[in-house]
A protein has these predicted regions:
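Histidine-centered active-site loop/cap adjacent to the catalytic His
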Residues: 79-107
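Short coil/turn segments at secondary-structure junctions
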Residues: 2, 78-79
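Conserved, well-ordered alpha-helix/loop/beta-strand core segments that scaffold catalytic motifs
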Residues: 1-68
Length: 107
């Protein structure tokens, strides 16, 4: 439950410090194969991620979500959590492409 745990986490403090120091905070969900699709993800995790996204949006924090990105297929992983060299290269390119407009616009 995100709401029950957020105040016990460092996230509010990280956001506060970033805002105070003019730092643009961007959070990223990487793809894993642990839950290969949204349908495979437990309902509690889906709810947690949804409330987290709402919290970040309310605090003007960008969230880049690659959780189920089809451009990162199973062949790019050495196991359910870790990408192989090809996966790392592909993810780096995707991340750079996603970050570029955020950095240019200052959103």
């Amino acid at each position: 439950d995100f709401d029950a745990s957020v105040d016990e986490s460092f996230l509010p403090e990280i956001i506060r410090l970033c805002k105070e120091n003019g730092i643009r905070l961007i959070l990223v969900h990487e793809r894993t194969l642990l839950f290969p699709s949204a349908a495979a993800e437990p309902k509690a995790l889906q709810a947690y991620k949804r409330v987290l996204a709402e919290y970040l949006q309310a605090n003007n924090i960008a969230l880049l979500d690659f959780s189920y990105d089809p451009r990162l297929p199973e062949e790019y992983f050495t196991d359910v959590l870790h990408m192989n060299a090809a996966g790392k290269a592909a993810f780096t390119q995707l991340l750079a492409e996603a970050l570029k407009p955020l950095m240019q616009s200052g959103q």
